Design a protein with these regions (language model features):
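Helix-to-loop junctions at the C-terminal end of transmembrane segments
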Residues: 18, 124-144
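Loop-to-transmembrane helix entry/capping segments in MFS-fold secondary transporters
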Residues: 1, 108-109, 174-175, 203-218
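Intracellular loop-helix junctions on the cytosolic face of multi-pass helical membrane proteins
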Residues: 1-2, 8, 14-94, 98-108, ...
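Loop-to-transmembrane helix entry
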Residues: 28, 99-123, 144, 171, ...
Length: 291
């Protein structure tokens, strides 16, 4: 919840800053992020006092051993790789969407506010969805979210396929992007809390915190691969207009810009099917062990 509150408030700076200094905003926003991170770190150092002081921290050797246990645990390793597929579709949005929307919908588009749809929906819905799915297994909840992800990518692609603007004053690119991000945020509500729950249940007693820390390996992997793929696809299907001598030449080069989202829909669908197979396989193995 706190992560998404921060995600929402942080993005409110982007569009006003871009209105003032133009594209340089995407450079200066990194300085803003660094400053906020330093302030948060100082606040933790100076103000945070743990209520639980019993026990000792782990040495780097123990942490390394814990990491080896996780990457040699086939069940957890496969789960991390599968969930990386979901987060690739999620993470790449911050690389693809701003340039896609500005290039396709025009300079007046507000990518910062469009991106804010995700944390807003998560903050509003995650508690309700988590309670609603409380009687279901973690894997069941995660499966629902995984199959929503390709739907979200397909919705995003529709903006370039529709004709006249459905809502006056809002381009179809922006409208369908918002719809897609809403579905993506709902998928996150189904997946994220239950993924952490599932991961913690695999941890030996007393090592839950360390296992939960390593559960976020998917963020590292999805950022690297998601952003890399986003750059390649933008260059191929929605290139920078400044590279073309005329508007007509750029329009011809970007006529299939929506193909970008098809790639991510396929990635999301493969990950969803993989999680479904993973769930059935592990369920069968667990039942066989109990028999």
């Amino acid at each position: 919840m706190m992560v998404n509150i921060g995600a929402f408030t942080g993005k409110t700076v982007v569009d006003p800053l871009r209105n003032v200094i133009g594209e340089q905003a995407y450079i200066y926003i990194n300085y803003f992020s660094a400053a906020m991170t330093v302030l948060a770190l100082l606040a933790v150092i100076l103000l945070y006092k743990s209520a639980h002081t019993a026990g000792e921290g782990k040495s780097m050797r123990e942490i390394g051993q814990g990491f080896l246990r996780i990457i040699t645990n086939w069940r957890l390793l496969i789960l991390i790789l599968i969930v990386t597929g979901f987060w690739m579709v999620q993470q790449q949005l911050y690389a693809t969407m701003p340039k896609y929307v500005i290039r396709m919908a025009g300079e007046t588009a507000k990518p910062g506010w469009i991106a804010n749809v995700n944390p807003f929906v998560v903050v509003c819905c995650v508690s309700f969805i988590t309670r609603w799915m409380a009687k279901r297994t973690a894997i069941t909840s995660m499966n629902i979210g995984m199959f929503l992800i390709p739907v979200s990518a397909l919705l995003m692609s529709c903006g370039n396929l529709l004709g006249n603007d459905i809502i006056s004053g809002m381009s179809n690119i922006t409208l369908m992007m918002v719809f897609g991000i809403v579905v993506q945020a709902l998928a996150e509500c189904f997946i994220s809390p239950r993924y952490l729950e599932y991961f913690s249940l695999q941890a030996p007693k007393g090592e839950e915190g360390m296992y939960l820390g390593f559960s976020h390996l998917h963020s590292f992997l999805s950022s690297i691969f998601g952003f890399g793929i986003a750059g390649v696809l933008l260059t191929k299907y929605c290139p920078d207009p400044v590279l073309f001598e005329t508007r007509e030449a750029w329009e011809a080069a970007s006529v299939n810009a929506h193909y970008i989202w098809y790639y991510f829909a396929v990635i999301g669908l493969v990950a969803a099917i993989a999680l479904f197979v993973f769930a059935k396989t592990t369920e069968f193995i667990d039942k066989k062990k109990k028999a």
